[in-house]
């Protein structure tokens, strides 16, 4: 997604996967910058596809809930993008359980694509997803791909536990 490294990672990835495209599941996100308006979602997906040098991604994520844009607008655009075969499965990142259910009610009402995959932060330290997100996903048969499984490096030893805080580091 553009928000990570200004899109450079997508360009690199696009070059690396050229020969192996059918063997991988390609994912991108939109909506972190500029919100979830139909115009912005379309623009961000098309820019990602251009950087990736691809015609489609397998999974397209909305980066987060947008209080300023009606779900109907966002999902109408997602419907058109899916019909154009620019993505095949819809994911949402950083949505609360109630937001996923509301999005799927709108999708059902208007025959828009429903949420197929959730992306909550989830690791051994940050386990809040176990309270509502994961049970809801199981109940609704929605897939889960967590982000930050290594806690931003906390669980890799990146941070030295022997260093204690003092007035100069807090």
Give the ranges of each region predicted by the language model.
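Short, acidic/polar
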Residues: 36-53, 73-76, 100-105
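Active-site groove signature of glycoside hydrolases
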Residues: 49-70
